[in-house]
């Protein structure tokens, strides 16, 4: 918290001292549009040097994704006090577009969530994650060859190492020029507090026994062209032990797929019960797969509750289960399902504990070493 506070104070002090011109587009009735974390309690912090420590420690800006105020962006607010404009500078002000440097990750252990998120407090929210709450979730896209810096969303993924992302194999079929985006939260805006990192995927390694139909061993590793830099909003998750079981536990799944028929802009957060293999097989038979269907060993099931389910667009996203110590491990990867959110129709996930040895072998093959234990 002290590091985060320091970064915010430095950002604000620089902003105030710069005397940058406030462009007309940032004006609003009675003030200027600034990022909400720069305007606590409705007024700009214009005297940082004399601000009470208690005013800044634990500072959190309330958010409502349906509240666009006069600034046409829910991450901005019309602030009643702002730095005085000058007549000479033409630079774009730091109040709305410049990102503060994220505090470095001082805890190098894997599986550490930012419980409750960072900086923002998203209100009136039941199925969306807080900002940076789950720092291992990855947004994977395919670059458009005809358009620079533009890409199409492909699937979700999970950071397990500074050079490795794990996802589903079927989502990478036929895909080239993949890029892994770290630190993403709301895909509809670029005004999040901390910068994202986009890193090219150098290699896709699919499980050697992967089969699309009937789907089996639906897991793939994305080898990054360079290491991702860990920060408070970008950290890896732990891998489970091969003997770990999660039946009966409620675990968290995240992604940007459909919810009630509409793709999510803000990363979702759904808490789902993990269901035993026999029970899941029975449910899937009744859901339409017939009396002879049996769930394969490489999968697990979660969900089965009405209108609470991962859906189209969530493939490759994580199912993270919390251990008694509070650490999160990657229990599953969203693979397939029958519809979305049907009663007694759970979603099917890759059972990561069945593939830990395979993942371990490739980490060793890549000669990738971390300074923390990734629970292999």
Swiss-Prot record:
SMART domains: Tryp_SPc
Native organism: Anopheles gambiae (African malaria mosquito)
Annotated glycan sites: 41, 125, 279, 369
All copies of domain Peptidase S1, residue ranges: 114-364
Domain of life: Eukaryota
SUPFAM superfamilies the record matches: Trypsin-like serine proteases
Reported phenotype of the disruption mutant: RNAi-mediated knockdown causes a loss in phenoloxidase (PO) activity, a reduction in microbe melanization and CLIPA14 proteolytic cleavage in response to S.aureus infection. Also, causes a reduction in microbe melanization and CLIPC9 proteolytic cleavage in response to E.coli infection. RNAi-mediated knockdown in the susceptible strain G3 infected with P.berghei, does not affect the number of oocysts and ookinete melanization; however, severely reduces ookinete melanization caused by CTL4 RNAi-mediated knockdown.
Extent of the signal sequence: 1-19
Any GO BP annotation: positive regulation of protein processing
Subcellular compartments: Secreted
Subunit structure: May form a heterodimer of a light chain and a heavy chain; disulfide-linked.
GO molecular function, a single term: serine-type endopeptidase activity
Record's function text: Inactive serine protease which plays an essential role in the innate immune response against bacteria, fungi and protozoa infection by activating the melanization cascade. In the melanization cascade, acts downstream of TEP1, SPCLIP1 and CLIPA8 to promote CLIPC9 proteolytic cleavage. In the susceptible strain G3, appears to be dispensable for parasite P.berghei ookinete elimination which occurs by lysis. Required for the melanization of Gram-positive and Gram-negative bacteria. Required for the melanization of fungus B.bassiana.
Lipoprotein keyword on record: no
Protein family per UniProt: Belongs to the peptidase S1 family. CLIP subfamily.
Chain spans, region Disordered: 85-106
Post-translational modification remark: Secreted as a full-length protein. Proteolytically cleaved into two chains which probably remain covalently linked. Cleavage is induced by fungus B.bassiana and Gram-positive or Gram-negative bacteria infection.
Main location: secreted
Gene Ontology cellular component terms for the protein in this record: extracellular space
InterPro entries documented for this protein: Peptidase_S1_PA, Peptidase_S1_PA_chymotrypsin, Peptidase_S1A, Trypsin_dom
Segments forming domain Clip: 24-80
S-S pairs: 28-78, 33-71, 39-79, 251-321, 280-301, 311-340
Name of one Pfam family that matches: Trypsin
Marked site: Cleavage: 60-61
Keyword vocabulary terms for this entry: Disulfide bond, Glycoprotein, Immunity, Innate immunity, Secreted, Serine protease homolog, Signal
Name of the protein described by the UniProt record: Inactive CLIP domain-containing serine protease A28
């Amino acid at each position: 918290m002290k590091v985060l506070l320091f970064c915010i104070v430095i950002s604000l002090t620089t902003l105030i001292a710069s005397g940058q011109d406030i462009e007309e587009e940032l004006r609003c009735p009675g003030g200027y549009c600034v990022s909400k974390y720069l305007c606590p309690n409705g007024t700009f912090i214009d005297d940082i040097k004399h601000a009470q420590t208690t005013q800044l420690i634990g500072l959190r800006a309330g958010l409502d994704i349906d509240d666009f105020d006069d600034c046409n962006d829910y991450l901005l607010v019309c602030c009643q006090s702002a730095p005085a404009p000058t007549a000479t500078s033409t630079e774009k002000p730091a109040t709305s577009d410049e990102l503060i440097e994220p505090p470095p990750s001082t805890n190098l252990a894997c599986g550490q969530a930012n419980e409750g998120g960072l900086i923002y407090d998203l209100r009136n929210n039941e199925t969306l994650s807080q900002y940076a709450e789950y720092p291992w979730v990855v947004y994977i896209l395919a670059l458009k060859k005809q358009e620079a810096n533009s890409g199409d969303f492909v699937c979700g993924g999970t950071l397990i190492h500074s050079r490795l992302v794990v996802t589903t194999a079927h989502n990478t079929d036929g895909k080239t020029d993949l890029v892994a985006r770290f630190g993403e939260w709301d895909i509809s805006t670029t005004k999040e507090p901390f910068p994202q990192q986009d890193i090219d995927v150098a290699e896709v390694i699919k499980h050697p026994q992967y089969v699309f139909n009937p789907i089996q061993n639906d897991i793939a590793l994305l080898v990054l062209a360079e290491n991702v830099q860990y920060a408070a909003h970008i950290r890896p998750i732990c891998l489970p032990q091969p003997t770990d079981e999660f039946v009966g536990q409620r675990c968290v799944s995240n992604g940007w797929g459909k919810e009630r028929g509409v793709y999510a802009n803000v990363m979702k957060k759904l808490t789902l019960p993990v269901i035993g293999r026999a029970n899941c097989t029975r449910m899937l038979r009744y859901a339409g797969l017939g009396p002879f269907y049996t769930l394969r060993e490489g999968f697990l099931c979660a969900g089965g509750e009405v209108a609470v389910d991962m859906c189209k667009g969530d493939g490759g996203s994580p199912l993270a289960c919390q251990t008694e110590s509070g650490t999160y491990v990657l229990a599953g990867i969203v693979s397939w399902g029958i519809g979305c959110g049907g009663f007694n129709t759970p979603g099917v996930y890759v059972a990561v504990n069945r593939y830990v040895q395979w993942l371990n072998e490739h980490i060793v093959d890549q000669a990738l070493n971390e300074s923390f234990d990734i629970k292999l």
